[in-house]
Structure formats: C-alpha cells, structure tokens
Amino acid sequence: MAHSNWLYQTRDIMFQIKEWLGVDKLLSLDAYKDYYGMDDINSILDVNYKVCRDVMCPANKDADEPGAKFVGGNEHAVVTPDSFKNVYKTVMDAELGPQFGYRGEGKIPLCWYAPILEMQSAASPSIVMFWCLTQGAITVLHEFATQKQQDLFIPKLRTGEWGGTMGLTEPGAGSEVGAVQSKAFPTDTPGKYKLTGTKCFISSGDHDLAENIIHLMLAKTPGAKEGTAGISLFIVPKFWVNDDGSLGAWNDVTTMGIEHKLGIHGSTTATLSMGENENCYGWMVGEAEVKDGRGIGMKQMFAYMNEERLNTGLFSLTLHFFLSCCFSCFPNSHNIQ
C-alpha cells in the first residue's frame, strides 16, 4: 500500500460522531465534561489521519516483505522492519496508541477511539496489532489489579515503552480454554508464583518495538478445579520488573517461533514457552485468591477478550471499507497496489 494509495476519507466519520451519534450529550457527562469538547475530536482525527497517511501507510509494504523475522535467542528473538520503529515511535509520541485504553480520570470516550483505530488498521493491519493488545492489557489491569500492580505496570504500558499480550491459547487448549495445562506454583512471597507452560498464537507475543512485554497469562494453581472454574490470571513480564519499576533479568519467557498470518505477515504472532529453565515468575492479578479450587481468571480475561473481539470486528469492517475505496478508484487508476 504505497503512500499514493491512501484513499481514506474522514467526512463519514465526522458525520457519524457529530451529527448522528450526538456525542455532545456524552461529553456533558461528569467523566468527560472537564476534559473534552467537540472541537477536540477534530484535532485528534486530523493528527491521526496525517500519521496514517504519511507514516503508517508507506511502512505497510514492509509488513509483507520483509515482514517480521524470527531470529531466535532468549532476549531478542524477533526483529521487525526498521520502518516499524519509526511508526511505533510516531504513534506513541502522538498518544494515538494504548493511551486510549486508560479508563481512569480524564479517559477519552471510546467512541472516539473507534475511528482512530479504523484509520490505523486501514493504513497497516499488521502494525496496529502492536498497540491494540497493549490497550487490552491496560483495561484488565485497571479493572482488576491491585493499586501497586497498576502503579508498577500501567504507566509504561500507556506510553508504549512496554507492550502487553493476551496469554490464553495453548497447543491443546484453544476454544476449550478450560483445558489449559499451564501451571502456577505459589512462592514464599504472597501473590508471587512460579509458572510453567506453553502459549501459542499470541498476538504481538515478542518484538523489538518495546523494551519489555507484559504477558497476562492464564494458568492453574495446584488443586484447582477442572475446566474454566479453576483458572487464574497472572502478570508475567518478559523481563522481571523490580519494585521501583526498573527492569531486572530475563524472566525465562522463550519465543519458540512466529506464525505467518494471511495479510498480516508483519504481525508477530508467537509461540511462547514459560519456565523452560524453571525460572519464570509472575503475579496473580489483583487480590484474588484461589478458594476451594476456584479462580477468577476467566472473568478477568473476558474483559480483554471482549475488547479484542470488538477490535477484530472493526478491523474486518475497515478492510471492507478500504477495499471499496480501492475499487471505486480503479476505473481512474491502475496503480492501486
């Protein structure tokens, strides 16, 4: 998708937000009235449009060739194209990435986030994956994590310095999530667990765009009930995070390889092995306790899953819309790539 092929139009979006949805009523609510006005959406969409047109769209060609490469090793196993680094930094500096996942004071209306994501996924479906999953991780931590966990992880997830993932699927546990075999063993430190297991098809599971990746991983503690009732959720960083927020040693999270998904070869969909050297640790999300073998990990993970389902639907709609733009221009140009 070359720069000249950026065909996106913003008129429909502005009509929907301003004239059809009546967002002015939403902005009168206490959560937004002291932070945003209708004019703000104009400036936000304008900046996002220019970033998509001038930075993301030209880099999309690299998403297919050369795409992301698996090079192996413990700490830096996946390499993305150089153009991705510029895109990632530009989006983070413009606060057009995971910052929208923040749901605390001063949060942005999610109906503003949808058109932002719509433009970005039209410009490059691969690249946008790197911060969409981070946004979901922020949502889960804000809703369920302890204050200490929020203070430790959310700030750098919001800035994109760290990435986030949804560690759900395993080789033998896809739709049947309750069959997860990953294990979490308590340590002498309350809330801290030693983890083992393999996760597959993990979107943005490893890459070189962020200095650390925070995996939200489903696992079962000893004596947990069978099925989804026994599942708990854990914060498992690629590099350990010290109490002061600094990075510690590699946390025994090994990238085994990446998939080549149709249409998003630049996206790093990874297979991850936790605890191969028996040195992988994580924190149970929140003040949760496993009582009578029951965990609340699935409840927590559904906040993540439901958000990503909406994002996936938006991706599909976006690609359909962008293709319709391409076809409408085809009689006048044969340079659409």
Ranges and model annotations:
Residues 20-30, 84-93, 110-113, 192-195, ...:
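Active-site-adjacent bridging/hinge elements
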Residues 129-147, 174:
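N-terminal glycine-rich flavin-associated loop
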Residues 201, 240-256, 261, 271-308, ...:
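A glycine-rich, basic-preceded beta-loop-alpha segment at the flavin cofactor/substrate interface
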